[in-house]
């Protein structure tokens, strides 16, 4: 029985899942919009939103916690220098998931996950 077990397994072992979400979180922070499968997008939301909340208070301890969770200096720098101040007045809900059809090869449901309040420049690049 799987009572009180939160999170999706996604047919991966725990280290593979951890690496997957580290990479997806870094990609989302750097590009501000990514296309992935719907279950991965829903689970990625649980990883990225606490990171952005952590980035709202810039301290050495918070930077170290963020680095421990992402293992990427560029991601931590963007979190604390850009995204933390951008979402300082927002109390949560930093991401938006938009369904975008099904993948051609295996008919998996696909979705865009993006950061809300993206600059217009990033929105134009994503459209191209």
Swiss-Prot record:
One of its GO terms (cellular component) is cytosolic large ribosomal subunit. InterPro entries: Ribosomal_bL17, Ribosomal_bL17_CS, Ribosomal_bL17_sf. The keyword Ribosomal protein applies. GO terms for molecular function: structural constituent of ribosome. Transmembrane segments: none annotated. The keyword Transmembrane does not apply. Gene3D superfamilies: Ribosomal protein L17. Keywords: Ribonucleoprotein, Ribosomal protein. Part of the 50S ribosomal subunit. Contacts protein L32. Belongs to the bacterial ribosomal protein bL17 family. PANTHER family: LARGE RIBOSOMAL SUBUNIT PROTEIN BL17M, RIBOSOMAL PROTEIN L17. This is Large ribosomal subunit protein bL17. It comes from Glaesserella parasuis serovar 5 (strain SH0165).
